[in-house]
Amino acid sequence: TTIILLIAFAAIQLSKADDLKFVFVMARGGDFVAGDYAGGPKIINKEAKDSELTEQGKQEAFQLGTKLSELYKTKLGVSKWDSKTTYWPVALSQKRTQVSTLITGAGLEGDQSKRNKAWTNEELKATSFPAMESFSRFIKPNECPKYLEELMKQKQEISTILKECSSSVQQVKSKYSAVNVNLPQHIWLAYETLKKLKRQQPSSSTWMTDDLMKNLRECSAKITWLATTKTDTLRKLSGGLLLNDLFNDMDQITQGKAQPNAPGGKDSKLNVFTVSQFLVISQLAAFMPEGSKLNNKAVTASDIYPEDGSHVDIEMYQENNKWSVKLVYVSGKDKQPQTITLPGCQEKCPYEQFKSALQKYKITDEEHQKACKN
């Protein structure tokens, strides 16, 4: 009996050896019915903002929850996933994104019956939190002209990127005349729309060859990474608010308090935030200053581009009263997890060092509103 007890005790100690205390997950929402993105070219003549999740999108969201449970349930010491106590699903205010985060929660709980559930307005509304709407401010020219102004200073480099895929873009334009070959956002958003069409309407998408899509993806990756990382101002305006909100929450957790607004208070161990692709990119930009590594290699735009099923996990550890942070990135549903390391940090970065490395990108909502206009 003593030996059995010792073995059980050793197993408990091993499972708690890394002392994982909390995980923030930012995930790209699941696949949805193809539509035209705001700011992009008219390809389908139906707005993407009204599109609902496809069956594949629901499956992706559920599988993410299942995967997160396998990864973190034991490590976090959670006996049962429950959105009122042990985890908090949040999302941007688009209905499909809210549905996506709730289905990810169903995946955590292992509840298949919720995959096709008709969610009530109350359930959808419960996925929002106060700071959320400000995160998208930077991409709205009327609310943040400074971001566009800063981006336009990079015109020369943007032109170089556009030349790299000009023949592919011309091919797309021959099919969809609304594509403006000189607008970088048209290239990226056209690629994202075409990718959905290729998957959802394969018979009418045979002209979209693998080489064409690969070339458009490469350009989209370079455009979006440049647009969020080329200068400190771009990093700050695109991802600084997210960073500020996360640091506020992380500060509370390192002081032994609950994540603010989490329904479960101190019992809450996991926060799932489902967002649009551009916010995953801007979060990565704010979390990866110059010199950061992805699996100990230099970062390329192509490696970082978030596909369907992508998510960033911020793991918070406490060892001997000292807190550290580990960043894990999965760039798509079939991709392996990669560790992000900041300059001067090991895989796990002491919390104060982590904060100090990113401090210059952090910005409050009030400061952000001013910086957007000045």
Swiss-Prot record:
Keywords: Disulfide bond, Secreted, Signal
Leader peptide range in chain numbering: 1-17
GO MF entry, a single one: phosphatase activity
Any one annotated GO CC term: extracellular region
UniProt subcellular location: Secreted
InterPro entries assigned to the protein according to its UniProt record, in alphabetical order: His_Pase_clade-2, His_PPase_superfam, Histidine_acid_phosphatase
Cysteine disulfide links: C144-C372, C165-C219, C345-C349
Binding site for serotonin: V25, D245, D249, N271, Q283
Pfam families found in the cross-reference section: His_Phos_2 (PF00328)
Function: Probably modulates blood feeding of fleas on vertebrate species by binding and sequestering different mediators involved in the host response. Binds biogenic amines: serotonin, adrenaline and noradrenaline. Binds leukotriene C4. Does not bind histamine, leukotriene B4, leukotriene D4, leukotriene E4, ADP, and stable analogs of thromboxane A2: U-46619 and cTXA2.
Free-text note on domains in this protein's UniProt record: Lipids and biogenic amines bind independently through different binding pockets.
Family of the protein in this entry: Belongs to the histidine acid phosphatase family.
The protein's name in its UniProt record: Acid phosphatase-like protein XcAP-1
Organism: Xenopsylla cheopis (Oriental rat flea)
